[in-house]
A protein has these predicted regions:
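Short amphipathic alpha-helices and their capping/turn segments at secondary-structure boundaries
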Residues: 26-29, 79-93, 97, 142-155
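Active-site-proximal loop/helix segment associated with metal-binding centers of metalloenzymes
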Residues: 98-154, 163-175, 247, 253, ...
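A short C-terminal boundary segment appended to hydrolase-like catalytic domains
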Residues: 243-286
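Active-site neighborhood of phospho(di)ester-bond hydrolases with catalytic His/Asp-centered motifs
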Residues: 6-8, 37-42, 64-70, 83-84, ...
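Beta-strand-turn-beta hairpins that frame and shape the catalytic cleft
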Residues: 1-5, 88-98, 103, 108, ...
Length: 286
């Protein structure tokens, strides 16, 4: 029996992952008996200087692999991005397929391509990336490559990708719904069903969901996300209500108000392992 651990959206730079955080993660993986760790994208905004050194250190403790998220692509060429796509690893009879994925605006079909591009240019991180094709073309190309690969595989298949493969996981708040266009594509799910993919792990959208089965595919989405979004940050304000601010719904403002407090730093140290554990998916394979 092999225990494969999956995480995503560590955002090492934004979350200021230092020695304590790394040691806490290593200890957690030991406690959980993880034999292999796969990280499904968004390690940091600097693959060469932050993510790869982090992975090299962690690799001394545990075998691991990863696929890129959109933040990892910053500063990379199209060839460098493609070099990390469509890795296949075998664990007994089970294959783990990992790739980034992308989006084609199909989650928000009521808006035009021009409207989506304006929103992306004004608000979305990916405006900083230098992709060679437009978004629908990147997604179509990715789907074509994915299908070619899945056609060649037999036995149980686990897929890890970064982007969202099913509409059930989209934003439902009216303000954020326009950003669903940049989350993924339902076409990935259709391929997973067609080729009987057993389990799918993804991130990108910083919400944690209980695993659920949709048309025979079990989906897991438990990204770590930014510290301002963490459960321990939310719980801190419940345990220390004197630090609440008038605009508690503004996550960055409430986090900035307490991040340097001794009470918050101590609280984070006490509860970090539980936060990381909540962002860990474990799949056992024969």
């Amino acid at each position: 029996m092999t225990r494969i651990g999956f995480m995503s959206d560590l955002h090492l730079d934004s979350n200021q992952f230092g020695d304590f955080e790394q040691q806490t993660l290593r200890q957690l993986l030991k406690e959980e008996g993880i034999d292999h760790l796969h990280i499904a994208g968004d390690l940091s905004n600097d693959l060469a200087k932050i993510s790869l050194p982090f992975l090299e250190t962690l690799k001394q403790e545990i075998p691991l692999s990863f696929n890129l998220g959109n933040h990892d692509m910053l500063g990379l060429s199209e060839q460098e991005i493609s070099n990390y796509d469509f890795q296949v690893q075998q664990f007994g009879q089970t294959k783990l397929v990992s790739f980034s994925g992308w989006y084609d605006y199909s989650f928000v079909p009521e808006k035009s391509k021009e409207e989506h591009l304006r929103t992306k240019t004004n608000f979305w991180f990916d405006r900083r990336l230098e992709r060679q094709l437009d978004d629908p073309s990147i997604t179509a190309q990715t789907l074509q490559e994915l299908e070619k690969l899945l056609m060649t595989l037999d036995g149980p298949i686990i897929v890890a990708l970064h982007f969202v493969p099913h509409q059930d996981f989209l934003y439902d708040h009216p303000y954020f719904q326009r950003f669903n266009a940049f989350l993924g594509s339902q076409a990935f799910h259709r391929l997973f069903v067609k080729y009987r993919v057993k389990e799918v792990i993804f991130g990108h959208l910083h919400h944690r969901h209980q695993s659920r089965v949709i048309e025979g595919v079990r989906y897991h989405m438990r990204p770590l996300g930014y510290i301002r979004e963490w459960e321990l940050t939310r719980n801190f304000f419940n345990d220390f209500p004197q630090y609440k601010i008038p605009q508690m719904y503004r996550l960055h403002k409430r986090y900035n108000a307490v991040k340097d407090l001794v009470e918050f730093r101590d609280y984070k140290k006490k509860h970090l392992a539980d936060e990381l554990r909540d962002a860990l998916t474990v799949i056992e394979v024969q």
